């Protein structure tokens, strides 16, 4: 599996290169991440690594989230161990807020911790996040329509889309016609972004350009598979 990690977008700033060039970068807190499960082809039909980022208090976690990590010693677990029943291996950590799977074979084991150091030799990455939700937006904002004339011949329709249908034939609106509607709050992947700096001490990645989502939003980072 190519180097992959989960993180949280912090915000944008600029840093200076050795030649004095100012570079706009997005700072991402990347890891540390706990390996929760390792998928295998024999058992699951595909190979992948499931990892989690950022601890979540057990009292706030759902049962499904608590089930992904090792349980605190309870009466039930003591009875099982006394009966010789072995539970599957689970990560010895708190429930995780952000959990994702990355496809591919890996040498990682359940309970391992993945850090940002794996990106020391990586130059380009793909970043996936949830874009900012903008609510119900018109066609000029959502689809970059030019709008109608600002003056002559237009009454209160300056930002309208105009006609959407046809005449007598086919007498309907085609599917996929671009109209006003929900904009944003969707899964977005920005590809081939340059890694400018890796701060392993503070678990930070500095990436040239914009990263999808608001400040504080969760993101998935993976080495790009694009060539060139």
Curated annotation (Swiss-Prot):
One of its GO terms (biological process) is translation. Residues 157-176 are annotated as: Disordered. InterPro entries: Ribosomal_uL3, Ribosomal_uL3_bac/org-type, Ribosomal_uL3_CS, Transl_B-barrel_sf. GO terms for cellular component: cytosolic large ribosomal subunit. Keywords: Ribonucleoprotein, Ribosomal protein, RNA-binding, rRNA-binding. Pfam families: Ribosomal_L3 (PF00297). GO terms for molecular function: rRNA binding; structural constituent of ribosome. Part of the 50S ribosomal subunit. Forms a cluster with proteins L14 and L19. NCBIfam families: L3_bact (TIGR03625). Belongs to the universal ribosomal protein uL3 family. One of the primary rRNA binding proteins, it binds directly near the 3'-end of the 23S rRNA, where it nucleates assembly of the 50S subunit. This is Large ribosomal subunit protein uL3. The lineage of its organism: Bacteria, Pseudomonadati, Planctomycetota, Planctomycetia, Pirellulales.
């Amino acid at each position: 599996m190519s180097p992959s990690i989960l993180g949280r977008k912090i915000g944008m700033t600029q840093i200076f290169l050795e030649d004095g060039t100012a570079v706009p970068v997005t700072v991402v807190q990347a890891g540390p991440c706990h390996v929760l499960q390792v998928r295998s082809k024999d058992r699951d039909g595909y190979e992948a690594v499931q990892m989690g980022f950022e601890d979540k208090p057990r009292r706030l976690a759902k049962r499904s989230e608590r089930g992904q990590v090792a349980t605190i010693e309870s009466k039930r677990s003591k009875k099982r161990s006394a009966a010789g029943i072995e539970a599957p291996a689970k990560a010895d950590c708190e429930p995780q807020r952000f959990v994702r799977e990355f496809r591919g074979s890996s040498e990682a084991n359940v309970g391992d911790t993945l850090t940002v150091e794996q990106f020391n030799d990586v130059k380009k990455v793909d970043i996936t996040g949830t874009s900012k939700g903008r609510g119900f937006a018109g066609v000029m904002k959502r689809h970059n329509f030019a709008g109608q004339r600002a003056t002559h011949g237009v009454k209160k329709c300056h930002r309208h889309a105009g006609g959407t249908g046809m005449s007598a034939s086919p007498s309907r609106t085609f599917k996929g016609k671009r109209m006003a509607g929900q904009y944003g709050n969707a899964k977005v992947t920005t590809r081939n972004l340059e890694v400018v700096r890796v701060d392993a001490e503070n678990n930070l990645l500095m990436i040239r350009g914009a990263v999808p989502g608001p400040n504080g939003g969760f993101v998935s980072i993976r080495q790009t598979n694009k060539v060139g």
